[in-house]
Protein backbone atom coordinates (compact mmCIF):
# COMPACT_ATOMS: atom_id res chain seq x y z
CA UNK A 1 0.00 0.00 0.00
CA UNK A 2 1.32 3.41 -0.91
CA UNK A 3 0.55 6.34 1.32
CA UNK A 4 0.28 9.75 -0.29
CA UNK A 5 0.22 12.88 1.80
CA UNK A 6 -0.52 16.20 0.13
CA UNK A 7 0.86 19.53 1.36
CA UNK A 8 -1.04 22.49 -0.08
CA UNK A 9 -4.24 24.47 -0.27
CA UNK A 10 -5.29 23.05 -3.63
CA UNK A 11 -7.73 20.32 -4.61
CA UNK A 12 -6.12 17.22 -6.07
CA UNK A 13 -8.10 14.49 -7.83
CA UNK A 14 -6.54 11.08 -7.29
CA UNK A 15 -8.23 7.93 -8.54
CA UNK A 16 -11.67 9.36 -7.93
CA UNK A 17 -10.77 11.17 -4.70
CA UNK A 18 -10.98 14.94 -4.50
CA UNK A 19 -9.49 16.42 -1.36
CA UNK A 20 -9.34 20.09 -0.39
CA UNK A 21 -7.09 20.93 2.51
CA UNK A 22 -8.10 22.84 5.60
CA UNK A 23 -8.65 26.50 4.58
CA UNK A 24 -6.54 27.94 7.38
CA UNK A 25 -3.61 29.99 6.05
CA UNK A 26 -0.09 28.61 5.77
CA UNK A 27 2.72 29.84 7.98
CA UNK A 28 3.98 33.36 7.22
CA UNK A 29 7.39 32.17 5.98
CA UNK A 30 7.10 31.67 2.22
CA UNK A 31 9.49 29.16 0.68
CA UNK A 32 8.26 28.90 -2.89
CA UNK A 33 6.96 31.54 -5.28
CA UNK A 34 6.15 31.84 -8.92
CA UNK A 35 4.96 34.64 -11.17
CA UNK A 36 3.59 35.18 -14.71
CA UNK A 37 3.85 37.93 -17.28
CA UNK A 38 2.50 38.02 -20.80
CA UNK A 39 -0.62 36.92 -22.58
CA UNK A 40 -1.61 35.50 -25.93
CA UNK A 41 -3.04 32.10 -26.72
CA UNK A 42 -0.44 30.08 -24.84
CA UNK A 43 -0.03 29.41 -21.13
CA UNK A 44 3.05 29.21 -18.96
CA UNK A 45 1.99 27.03 -16.07
CA UNK A 46 4.14 26.51 -13.01
CA UNK A 47 3.62 24.81 -9.70
CA UNK A 48 5.54 23.46 -6.78
CA UNK A 49 4.06 20.83 -4.51
CA UNK A 50 5.60 18.97 -1.57
CA UNK A 51 4.27 15.42 -1.08
CA UNK A 52 4.98 12.55 1.28
CA UNK A 53 5.10 8.94 0.11
CA UNK A 54 5.55 5.97 2.44
CA UNK A 55 8.14 3.53 1.05
CA UNK A 56 9.14 0.10 2.40
CA UNK A 57 12.60 0.01 3.94
CA UNK A 58 14.75 -2.76 5.47
CA UNK A 59 13.55 -1.80 8.96
CA UNK A 60 10.26 -3.51 8.15
CA UNK A 61 8.20 -0.35 8.63
CA UNK A 62 7.36 2.18 5.93
CA UNK A 63 9.49 5.29 5.85
CA UNK A 64 7.97 8.65 4.98
CA UNK A 65 9.86 10.25 2.11
CA UNK A 66 9.23 13.93 1.48
CA UNK A 67 9.22 14.63 -2.26
CA UNK A 68 9.28 18.16 -3.63
CA UNK A 69 8.04 18.67 -7.19
CA UNK A 70 8.66 21.90 -9.12
CA UNK A 71 7.50 22.09 -12.73
CA UNK A 72 7.12 24.52 -15.61
CA UNK A 73 5.03 23.86 -18.72
CA UNK A 74 5.53 26.46 -21.45
CA UNK A 75 2.85 26.14 -24.10
CA UNK A 76 2.94 27.20 -27.74
CA UNK A 77 0.40 27.25 -30.60
CA UNK A 78 -2.36 27.09 -28.02
CA UNK A 79 -2.74 26.31 -24.33
CA UNK A 80 -4.19 22.80 -24.50
CA UNK A 81 -0.94 20.85 -24.14
CA UNK A 82 0.43 22.84 -21.21
CA UNK A 83 -2.93 22.76 -19.43
CA UNK A 84 -3.35 19.01 -19.79
CA UNK A 85 0.24 18.32 -18.73
CA UNK A 86 -0.14 20.36 -15.56
CA UNK A 87 -3.49 18.77 -14.75
CA UNK A 88 -2.25 15.20 -15.14
CA UNK A 89 1.28 15.28 -13.74
CA UNK A 90 0.58 14.81 -10.03
CA UNK A 91 -2.12 12.19 -10.57
CA UNK A 92 -0.06 10.15 -13.00
CA UNK A 93 3.09 10.44 -10.90
CA UNK A 94 1.33 9.24 -7.74
CA UNK A 95 -0.48 6.44 -9.53
CA UNK A 96 2.70 5.12 -11.12
CA UNK A 97 4.39 5.04 -7.73
CA UNK A 98 1.46 2.97 -6.48
CA UNK A 99 1.57 0.66 -9.51
CA UNK A 100 5.32 0.12 -9.24
CA UNK A 101 5.22 -0.66 -5.52
CA UNK A 102 2.15 -2.85 -5.89
CA UNK A 103 3.75 -4.76 -8.76
CA UNK A 104 6.94 -5.21 -6.78
CA UNK A 105 5.26 -6.78 -3.76
CA UNK A 106 2.39 -8.63 -5.42
CA UNK A 107 4.59 -10.05 -8.23
CA UNK A 108 1.59 -9.50 -10.52
CA UNK A 109 3.59 -7.40 -12.96
CA UNK A 110 1.72 -5.41 -15.58
CA UNK A 111 4.91 -3.70 -16.77
CA UNK A 112 8.63 -3.63 -16.15
CA UNK A 113 10.36 -2.07 -13.18
CA UNK A 114 13.83 -0.60 -13.56
CA UNK A 115 16.33 -3.36 -14.43
CA UNK A 116 18.17 -2.83 -11.15
CA UNK A 117 15.09 -4.12 -9.29
CA UNK A 118 14.22 -7.14 -11.40
CA UNK A 119 16.38 -9.60 -9.45
CA UNK A 120 14.38 -8.88 -6.30
CA UNK A 121 11.08 -10.34 -7.47
CA UNK A 122 11.66 -13.94 -6.37
CA UNK A 123 12.30 -13.04 -2.75
CA UNK A 124 9.66 -13.46 -0.08
CA UNK A 125 8.29 -10.33 1.59
CA UNK A 126 10.73 -10.16 4.52
CA UNK A 127 13.78 -11.10 2.46
CA UNK A 128 12.57 -8.64 -0.16
CA UNK A 129 12.57 -5.79 2.35
CA UNK A 130 15.93 -6.87 3.75
CA UNK A 131 17.37 -6.86 0.24
CA UNK A 132 16.08 -3.45 -0.85
CA UNK A 133 18.89 -1.18 -2.00
CA UNK A 134 19.22 2.11 -0.19
CA UNK A 135 18.17 4.00 -3.30
CA UNK A 136 15.10 1.82 -3.92
CA UNK A 137 12.70 4.72 -3.41
CA UNK A 138 14.73 6.98 -5.71
CA UNK A 139 14.55 4.34 -8.47
CA UNK A 140 10.79 4.19 -8.03
CA UNK A 141 10.40 7.99 -8.07
CA UNK A 142 12.46 8.32 -11.25
CA UNK A 143 10.63 5.52 -13.05
CA UNK A 144 7.24 6.89 -11.96
CA UNK A 145 8.10 10.34 -13.30
CA UNK A 146 9.27 8.99 -16.66
CA UNK A 147 6.13 6.87 -16.99
CA UNK A 148 3.96 9.83 -16.02
CA UNK A 149 5.54 11.99 -18.72
CA UNK A 150 5.07 9.22 -21.30
CA UNK A 151 1.41 8.82 -20.35
CA UNK A 152 0.79 12.58 -20.40
CA UNK A 153 2.06 12.78 -23.95
CA UNK A 154 0.09 9.69 -24.99
CA UNK A 155 -3.10 11.11 -23.48
CA UNK A 156 -2.62 14.47 -25.16
CA UNK A 157 -1.75 12.83 -28.48
CA UNK A 158 -5.07 10.99 -28.44
CA UNK A 159 -6.94 14.18 -27.52
CA UNK A 160 -5.10 16.26 -30.11
CA UNK A 161 -5.78 13.71 -32.84
CA UNK A 162 -9.49 13.74 -32.04
CA UNK A 163 -9.82 17.52 -31.74
CA UNK A 164 -7.27 18.44 -34.43
CA UNK A 165 -5.12 20.40 -31.97
CA UNK A 166 -1.77 21.88 -33.01
CA UNK A 167 -0.49 22.95 -29.59
CA UNK A 168 2.59 21.73 -27.81
CA UNK A 169 4.41 22.37 -24.55
CA UNK A 170 7.78 22.17 -22.93
CA UNK A 171 8.09 20.38 -19.61
CA UNK A 172 10.81 20.83 -17.03
CA UNK A 173 10.21 18.92 -13.81
CA UNK A 174 12.47 18.78 -10.77
CA UNK A 175 12.18 16.23 -7.95
CA UNK A 176 13.84 16.67 -4.56
CA UNK A 177 13.95 13.71 -2.17
CA UNK A 178 16.31 12.64 0.61
CA UNK A 179 18.66 15.53 -0.09
CA UNK A 180 18.98 14.61 -3.76
CA UNK A 181 17.80 16.29 -6.94
CA UNK A 182 16.59 14.91 -10.29
CA UNK A 183 15.53 16.97 -13.31
CA UNK A 184 13.68 15.80 -16.43
CA UNK A 185 13.28 18.25 -19.29
CA UNK A 186 11.59 18.43 -22.68
CA UNK A 187 12.08 21.56 -24.77
CA UNK A 188 13.79 24.75 -23.64
CA UNK A 189 12.44 25.56 -20.18
CA UNK A 190 15.34 25.65 -17.77
CA UNK A 191 16.38 24.41 -14.34
CA UNK A 192 19.44 25.73 -12.54
CA UNK A 193 21.11 25.75 -9.15
CA UNK A 194 22.48 28.84 -7.43
CA UNK A 195 25.23 27.70 -5.07
CA UNK A 196 27.45 29.66 -2.71
CA UNK A 197 31.14 29.86 -3.53
CA UNK A 198 33.89 31.86 -1.89
CA UNK A 199 35.63 34.40 -4.12
CA UNK A 200 39.07 35.80 -3.42
CA UNK A 201 39.40 39.57 -2.91
CA UNK A 202 40.46 39.91 -6.56
CA UNK A 203 37.46 37.91 -7.79
CA UNK A 204 35.18 39.77 -5.40
CA UNK A 205 36.37 43.11 -6.75
CA UNK A 206 35.54 42.06 -10.31
CA UNK A 207 32.08 40.93 -9.19
CA UNK A 208 31.39 44.19 -7.39
CA UNK A 209 32.55 46.26 -10.36
CA UNK A 210 30.19 44.29 -12.61
CA UNK A 211 27.26 44.83 -10.24
CA UNK A 212 28.10 48.51 -9.79
CA UNK A 213 28.17 49.11 -13.54
CA UNK A 214 24.91 47.27 -13.92
CA UNK A 215 23.28 49.40 -11.26
CA UNK A 216 24.70 52.60 -12.66
CA UNK A 217 23.07 51.80 -16.01
CA UNK A 218 19.83 51.30 -14.13
CA UNK A 219 20.38 54.47 -12.05
CA UNK A 220 19.99 52.63 -8.76
CA UNK A 221 23.43 52.99 -7.17
CA UNK A 222 26.01 55.61 -6.28
CA UNK A 223 29.85 55.76 -6.29
CA UNK A 224 29.93 56.29 -2.55
CA UNK A 225 27.90 53.12 -2.03
CA UNK A 226 30.38 51.16 -4.17
CA UNK A 227 33.25 52.38 -1.96
CA UNK A 228 31.41 51.02 1.05
CA UNK A 229 30.99 47.66 -0.69
CA UNK A 230 34.71 47.43 -1.45
CA UNK A 231 35.48 47.95 2.23
CA UNK A 232 32.89 45.40 3.34
CA UNK A 233 34.28 42.68 1.06
CA UNK A 234 37.99 43.44 1.02
CA UNK A 235 38.71 39.99 2.53
CA UNK A 236 36.71 38.11 -0.08
CA UNK A 237 33.10 37.40 -0.93
CA UNK A 238 30.55 34.59 -0.79
CA UNK A 239 28.74 34.63 -4.12
CA UNK A 240 26.11 32.51 -5.87
CA UNK A 241 27.45 30.59 -8.87
CA UNK A 242 24.99 29.28 -11.45
CA UNK A 243 24.93 25.66 -12.57
CA UNK A 244 22.57 24.88 -15.43
CA UNK A 245 20.85 21.51 -14.97
CA UNK A 246 19.14 21.26 -18.36
CA UNK A 247 20.15 21.45 -22.01
CA UNK A 248 17.87 23.31 -24.40
CA UNK A 249 16.30 21.08 -27.02
CA UNK A 250 16.80 23.42 -29.95
CA UNK A 251 16.96 21.99 -33.46
CA UNK A 252 20.43 23.46 -34.12
CA UNK A 253 21.93 21.30 -31.36
CA UNK A 254 24.02 18.74 -33.21
CA UNK A 255 22.41 15.58 -31.85
CA UNK A 256 18.92 17.04 -32.18
CA UNK A 257 19.55 18.18 -35.75
CA UNK A 258 20.84 14.74 -36.73
CA UNK A 259 17.64 13.13 -35.48
CA UNK A 260 15.42 15.66 -37.27
CA UNK A 261 17.29 15.23 -40.55
CA UNK A 262 17.29 11.44 -40.24
CA UNK A 263 13.49 11.56 -39.98
CA UNK A 264 13.19 13.65 -43.14
CA UNK A 265 12.88 17.06 -41.53
CA UNK A 266 15.13 20.07 -41.93
CA UNK A 267 16.35 22.93 -39.77
CA UNK A 268 16.38 26.53 -40.92
CA UNK A 269 16.25 29.93 -39.24
CA UNK A 270 13.21 32.14 -39.20
CA UNK A 271 13.34 35.50 -37.39
CA UNK A 272 16.84 34.53 -36.30
CA UNK A 273 15.68 31.37 -34.49
CA UNK A 274 16.54 27.83 -35.70
CA UNK A 275 13.31 25.93 -36.33
CA UNK A 276 12.19 22.46 -37.38
CA UNK A 277 10.91 22.79 -40.95
CA UNK A 278 11.16 26.55 -40.51
CA UNK A 279 8.38 26.59 -37.87
CA UNK A 280 8.91 24.86 -34.52
CA UNK A 281 11.61 26.33 -32.25
CA UNK A 282 12.08 23.20 -30.10
CA UNK A 283 13.04 19.69 -31.15
CA UNK A 284 11.37 17.94 -28.19
CA UNK A 285 7.94 18.70 -26.80
CA UNK A 286 4.68 17.33 -25.49
CA UNK A 287 2.20 17.43 -28.38
CA UNK A 288 3.13 19.12 -31.66
CA UNK A 289 1.72 16.17 -33.59
CA UNK A 290 2.42 17.79 -36.96
CA UNK A 291 6.16 17.46 -36.37
CA UNK A 292 6.30 13.94 -34.95
CA UNK A 293 7.11 12.43 -38.33
CA UNK A 294 10.00 14.89 -38.67
CA UNK A 295 12.01 13.84 -35.64
CA UNK A 296 10.37 15.89 -32.88
CA UNK A 297 10.05 13.60 -29.85
CA UNK A 298 8.61 13.76 -26.33
CA UNK A 299 11.35 11.76 -24.58
CA UNK A 300 12.80 13.79 -21.69
CA UNK A 301 16.49 14.31 -21.11
CA UNK A 302 17.23 13.40 -17.50
CA UNK A 303 19.80 14.68 -15.06
CA UNK A 304 19.84 11.68 -12.74
CA UNK A 305 19.78 11.90 -8.96
CA UNK A 306 22.64 13.97 -7.59
CA UNK A 307 23.21 14.99 -3.97
CA UNK A 308 22.47 18.51 -2.87
CA UNK A 309 25.30 19.96 -0.81
CA UNK A 310 25.41 22.58 1.91
CA UNK A 311 26.25 25.46 -0.39
CA UNK A 312 23.34 24.81 -2.79
CA UNK A 313 21.03 27.72 -1.98
CA UNK A 314 18.28 28.00 -4.62
CA UNK A 315 16.71 25.87 -7.31
CA UNK A 316 15.21 27.87 -10.18
CA UNK A 317 12.82 26.35 -12.73
CA UNK A 318 11.57 28.73 -15.41
CA UNK A 319 10.34 29.23 -18.93
CA UNK A 320 12.87 30.33 -21.52
CA UNK A 321 11.50 33.88 -21.55
CA UNK A 322 13.37 34.67 -18.33
CA UNK A 323 16.63 34.13 -20.19
CA UNK A 324 15.77 35.99 -23.37
CA UNK A 325 17.76 38.94 -22.00
CA UNK A 326 19.42 37.39 -18.92
CA UNK A 327 22.21 34.86 -18.56
CA UNK A 328 21.78 32.10 -15.98
CA UNK A 329 24.50 33.74 -13.88
CA UNK A 330 22.52 37.00 -13.94
CA UNK A 331 19.62 35.21 -12.25
CA UNK A 332 21.85 33.91 -9.46
CA UNK A 333 23.49 37.33 -9.10
CA UNK A 334 20.07 38.88 -8.55
CA UNK A 335 19.14 36.28 -5.94
CA UNK A 336 22.48 36.88 -4.23
CA UNK A 337 21.79 40.61 -4.10
CA UNK A 338 18.40 39.98 -2.51
CA UNK A 339 19.89 37.59 0.04
CA UNK A 340 22.52 40.18 0.96
CA UNK A 341 20.27 43.20 0.97
CA UNK A 342 21.78 44.37 4.27
CA UNK A 343 24.77 45.32 2.14
CA UNK A 344 23.05 45.71 -1.20
CA UNK A 345 19.53 46.81 -0.33
CA UNK A 346 19.98 50.23 -1.90
CA UNK A 347 20.20 48.59 -5.32
CA UNK A 348 17.52 45.90 -5.02
CA UNK A 349 14.23 46.88 -6.74
CA UNK A 350 11.12 47.03 -4.59
CA UNK A 351 9.47 44.15 -6.46
CA UNK A 352 12.21 41.86 -5.17
CA UNK A 353 10.76 42.25 -1.69
CA UNK A 354 7.53 40.58 -2.86
CA UNK A 355 9.01 37.24 -3.85
CA UNK A 356 12.12 35.81 -5.46
CA UNK A 357 10.17 34.60 -8.49
CA UNK A 358 8.64 38.05 -8.94
CA UNK A 359 12.15 39.41 -8.70
CA UNK A 360 13.44 37.25 -11.56
CA UNK A 361 10.39 37.76 -13.78
CA UNK A 362 10.37 41.53 -13.37
CA UNK A 363 14.14 41.79 -13.76
CA UNK A 364 13.87 39.97 -17.11
CA UNK A 365 10.89 42.11 -18.09
CA UNK A 366 12.77 45.34 -17.36
CA UNK A 367 15.72 44.04 -19.37
CA UNK A 368 13.45 43.84 -22.39
CA UNK A 369 12.23 40.25 -22.56
CA UNK A 370 9.17 40.15 -24.82
CA UNK A 371 8.19 36.54 -24.15
CA UNK A 372 5.70 35.24 -21.63
CA UNK A 373 7.54 34.33 -18.45
CA UNK A 374 7.08 32.01 -15.50
CA UNK A 375 9.42 30.97 -12.70
CA UNK A 376 9.62 28.87 -9.56
CA UNK A 377 12.32 29.63 -6.98
CA UNK A 378 12.85 26.99 -4.30
CA UNK A 379 15.05 27.84 -1.29
CA UNK A 380 17.10 24.74 -0.47
CA UNK A 381 18.30 25.69 3.01
CA UNK A 382 15.00 25.59 4.86
CA UNK A 383 15.21 23.71 8.17
CA UNK A 384 11.48 23.44 8.75
CA UNK A 385 10.43 20.49 10.89
CA UNK A 386 7.45 19.16 8.99
CA UNK A 387 6.94 16.28 11.40
CA UNK A 388 5.96 18.72 14.17
CA UNK A 389 3.13 20.27 12.16
CA UNK A 390 -0.54 19.27 12.63
CA UNK A 391 -1.93 16.77 10.13
CA UNK A 392 -5.36 15.51 9.16
CA UNK A 393 -6.18 12.33 7.31
CA UNK A 394 -8.77 11.24 4.78
CA UNK A 395 -9.01 7.70 3.43
CA UNK A 396 -10.71 7.22 0.08
CA UNK A 397 -12.20 4.12 -1.53
CA UNK A 398 -9.04 3.44 -3.53
CA UNK A 399 -7.03 2.86 -0.38
CA UNK A 400 -4.88 5.96 -0.79
CA UNK A 401 -4.26 7.91 2.38
CA UNK A 402 -3.92 11.63 1.88
CA UNK A 403 -2.65 13.78 4.72
CA UNK A 404 -2.74 17.55 4.51
CA UNK A 405 -0.52 19.94 6.40
CA UNK A 406 1.17 23.28 6.04
CA UNK A 407 4.48 21.94 7.31
CA UNK A 408 6.29 23.26 4.24
CA UNK A 409 5.12 26.80 3.48
CA UNK A 410 4.02 27.25 -0.10
CA UNK A 411 2.18 30.00 -1.93
CA UNK A 412 0.40 29.08 -5.14
CA UNK A 413 -0.16 31.67 -7.85
CA UNK A 414 -1.44 30.17 -11.07
CA UNK A 415 -3.37 31.01 -14.20
CA UNK A 416 -5.08 27.62 -14.00
CA UNK A 417 -8.17 28.08 -11.81
CA UNK A 418 -9.39 24.48 -11.92
CA UNK A 419 -6.17 23.18 -10.38
CA UNK A 420 -4.93 26.01 -8.19
CA UNK A 421 -6.78 28.54 -6.11
CA UNK A 422 -5.74 32.17 -5.99
CA UNK A 423 -5.66 33.54 -2.50
UniProtKB/Swiss-Prot annotation:
The keyword rRNA processing does not apply. It comes from the Eukaryota. One of its GO terms (molecular function) is metal ion binding. Binds 2 magnesium or manganese ions per subunit. PROSITE patterns: PPM_2. It catalyses: O-phospho-L-seryl-[protein] + H2O = L-seryl-[protein] + phosphate; O-phospho-L-threonyl-[protein] + H2O = L-threonyl-[protein] + phosphate. Mn(2+) 2 binds at residues 74, 320, 371. Its EC number is 3.1.3.16. Keywords: Hydrolase, Magnesium, Manganese, Metal-binding, Protein phosphatase. Its cofactor is Mg(2+); Mn(2+). Residues 52-380 form the PPM-type phosphatase domain. Mn(2+) 1 binds at residues 74-75. Belongs to the PP2C family. PANTHER family: PROTEIN PHOSPHATASE (PTHR47992). This is Putative protein phosphatase 2C 50.
Amino acid sequence: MVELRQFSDLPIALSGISRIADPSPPPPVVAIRRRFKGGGNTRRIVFSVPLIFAFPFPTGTPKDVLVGIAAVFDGHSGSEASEMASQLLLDYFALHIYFLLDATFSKELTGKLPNSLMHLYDLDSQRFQDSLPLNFHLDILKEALLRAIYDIDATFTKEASTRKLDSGSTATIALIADGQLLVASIGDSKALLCSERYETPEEAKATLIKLYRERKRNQDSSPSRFSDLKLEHRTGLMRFIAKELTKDHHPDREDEMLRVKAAGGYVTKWAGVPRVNGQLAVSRSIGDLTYRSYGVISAPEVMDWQPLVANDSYLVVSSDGIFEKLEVQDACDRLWEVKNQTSFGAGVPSYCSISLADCLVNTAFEKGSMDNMAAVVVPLKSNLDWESQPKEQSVGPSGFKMKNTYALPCEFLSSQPNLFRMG
